[in-house]
Structure formats: C-alpha cells, structure tokens
Amino acid sequence: MISRSALSRGSQLALRRPAAAKTAQRGFAAAAASPAASYEPTTIAGVKVASRDDSGPTTRLAVVAKAGTRYEPLPGLTVGLEEFAFKNTNKRTALRITRESELLGGQLQAYHTREAVVLQASFLREDLPYFTELLAEVISETKYTTHEFHELVENCIHEKQAKLDSAAIALDAAHNVAFHSGLGSPLYPTVDTPTSSYLNENSVAAFANLAYNKANIAVVADGASQAGLEKWVEPFFKGVPATSSGNLNTAASKYFGGEQRVAKNGKNAIVIAFPGASLGVPHPETSVLVGLLGGVSNIKWSPGFSLLAKATAANPGAEAFAHNYAYSDAGLLAIQITGKGAAVGKVAVEAVKGLKAIAAGGVSKEDLTKAIAKAKFNLLSASEVSGTGLVHAGANLLAGGKPIQVAETLKALEGVTAEKLQAAAKKLLEGKASVSAVGDLHVLPYAEDLGLKV
C-alpha cells in the first residue's frame, strides 16, 4: 500500500498551496470562457473509466456500480451494500480509513440511486493515488462482519426508514405504478417491508460479489487527468474480479402508468408523472419543459416565470417543482407537490392546466427563452453542484453508451421551438400518467379529477 507516503504529503497542508492557487485562477478563467468539459471515456485494465480535468486544485473520484435498487434481488440489499462502504477491510480498519482521510483533508461518502451504488471521495488532486487505492480496496476487500451489520448497518437502515416522509413515499409510489418492478422498487425499504427475512451480512456479501466486478463498475473522475488515472487505476484495480459467477436482473424497463393512494398523517404529497427522457438519448424538449414547469423561484421577492411557481404563489401552503428522473433505458418526468392538503390539491389542478396550456400552444416567446436558459443552467450546474454528472457518466458507461456531450446538448437545447415543446406536452397528455397521492385522501384529488388518463 502507498498510504504512508500519501499521508506524509497530507501532513504538509500548511506548506503546499501557492502553485495550487495559481492553477485554480487559470481554471476559473477557463470556466468563464467556455462550457464545462465533457467526460472522456476509456478502458483501463478492463475497467470502464471516464474523466475530465479542469486543472483545479481538487478532485472527485467515484466508483459507480450497477447495484441500485433496480437490480437488487432482495429488498434492502442495495442500502445494506451502501452502509458497509468504508467499514473494515482486509487491510484497514474503519477507524484507520477515517483518520487517514481526515489527515489528507478528504471527504468520503456512499449513496445509491435506483440504478447505482456510488462510492465517492473528494480530495486535493495530488492525493489521487491514495484515494484510488482506497476505493479499489473497499469494493474488493471489505469484510461483511456480523457485528458491524447488527451494530451499525442495521441501525442506519432503520434510521433512514424512519425518516421517509410523504414526498419520498409519493415518489416511490409513482415509480412503482410507472414501472412496477425494477425501477419501480422503492429507493429505501419502507418500515413495513420484512427486511429481516432477506437482509443479513451474508446476503449483502453475496450481492457485493455480484455487483463489484470489472464488468459491472465504472470509475469516474472530475478534476483528474486521464494519464493520472491510467497510472493508478491499473495497479490498484487489478485485484477486482473481472466478472461474477452470478447475474443481476437486467430486464428492460417497461412503462405502465396508473394510480396509487396512501393514507398517512402529516404533510400531504402528490406526484404527477409521465414517461421522461432517458440517459444518453437526446430529448431537449423534456429539459426545456422541466424549465418551463419549474418550481421554486430563483429570484427573491418574485414568484418567477415558471408555471408551478405561479401556482404555489397563488396557493400558500404548498411547494412544487418538476424534475426529469433519467435512467439508462427509461425516464420519468415528475411534478412533485407537497404541503397542506387543500393547497396541494389546488396546485395539482393548476399544474395539469398549465401542461394542457403548453399542449395547446400557449407558450410565449419570452417564456420559451427563459425556459431554455434555465435548462442550460440546470445542465451545466448539475455536475458542479450536486455531483449528478459523475453518476450519469458512470451509468452511461455501464449501459454501453458514452457520457453526455455538453456542447452538443447545449446546441440541441437552443434548437427547441414552441412547436416542438407543444408536441412534447401533447404526447404526454395523450398517454397514461402515473399519479400518486400520500396524506389526507379525503382532500387529495384522484387522477380523474385532474383530467388525466391512468
């Protein structure tokens, strides 16, 4: 291992940074002059890799594994795999991993989506060797011990189950009626799911063997050169198995549509969803439609131009926003509304009215221009702010595609016209919607009340 030398570099934090500051200044100038660079894909020692380098002082490195809830053979295995990340390995204890990362100023996190488990490290760019080694070690040499499962992993899962609110339950329900199994599986198992029948350290270890192999992972770096990755990925990931003896369930997604209603105390939530844009398939109209539907205003003291922002301003007590959930072979364009029951119902009615107005050609030139600009901002800021770009780049590689090409996508957004947007909205309304309501069902409307087909 090279951790000792990496740590000796990490202990000199106070003496390092004049060169890095100059590098950062050059990076900021470059960012102002041109759009964010796209991730460049390659294969290193059998591992799919994507990287982009803005010459900044920090790096984000992630292992994206095709092990999200869509692929778990039993409920709870994905979150179990996530919670075992950065625990004891054959070479290091969890305490040592934590202390070494802190000495280097690094940040470690593990999370999952419906399609992926993501192990991510953020650090100073000269510490790439240490964190590349660490991520390879975590996926190939983690100990799935009984005491850690019962004392740490199981408790974390129960805490996350207890935190599930109406908005999360409604979004899961919308996915369930839209896709049934696969993408329809909940992001976290509910409190009523009998996970004890399926979830233990042995089942998580078996799932790890299916998930963590070269055919099923992608390594994605933001802020690292491809040459640097080639230098360190090859020696450190050589111990990762090439394939697995078993197979994940990779059946193609199919959209169904439908309605689900769940009675629950507390805040109310409605999700109105339609087939959306998938990863790697250009559909700029969906991105512009999301910008036009909008949600929370970006301008203080103004409701903003978006349809949902205006609807919530007229109905205090509710919040709403639109988002396209993009997956490898499907997408879900969702309007999510939460708040007091009566206000949520009224905003839902206004949201559908707004969508029908778009389908009827009622979009002004000014609003279209604003929506396109908002779609551009969402695209360029996603990877910088939330790390979405890392996950999407990895997911595209695992699906056999290539990471999104920023320049091409920006050009496609500029080509969206009012007629194209009208046609896209009309197609959504002509098909089956996926509608979920959680909360006071006496107040929350049915899909039929909203004028939607399910």
Swiss-Prot record:
Top-level taxon in the UniProt lineage: Eukaryota
Membrane topology type: Peripheral membrane protein
Effect of gene knockout: Mutants display reduced growth, are female sterile and lack active complex III.
Pfam families with a match to the protein in the record: Peptidase_M16, Peptidase_M16_C
Keywords, ordered alphabetically: Electron transport, Membrane, Mitochondrion, Mitochondrion inner membrane, Respiratory chain, Transit peptide, Transport
GO molecular function, one term: metal ion binding
Subcellular location: Mitochondrion inner membrane
Transit peptide (first-last residue): 1-35
GO cellular component: mitochondrial inner membrane; mitochondrion
Endpoints of the signal sequence: none
Quaternary structure note: Component of the ubiquinol-cytochrome c oxidoreductase (cytochrome b-c1 complex, complex III, CIII), a multisubunit enzyme composed of 10 subunits. The complex is composed of 3 respiratory subunits cytochrome b (cob), cytochrome c1 (cyt-1) and Rieske protein (fes-1), 2 core protein subunits pep and ucr-1, and 5 low-molecular weight protein subunits qcr6, qcr7, qcr8, qcr9 and probably NCU16844/qcr10.
Free-text function comment from the UniProt entry: Component of the ubiquinol-cytochrome c oxidoreductase, a multisubunit transmembrane complex that is part of the mitochondrial electron transport chain which drives oxidative phosphorylation.
UniProt record similarity statement: Belongs to the peptidase M16 family. UQCRC2/QCR2 subfamily.
Protein name as catalogued: Cytochrome b-c1 complex subunit 2, mitochondrial
Source species of the chain: Neurospora crassa (strain ATCC 24698 / 74-OR23-1A / CBS 708.71 / DSM 1257 / FGSC 987)
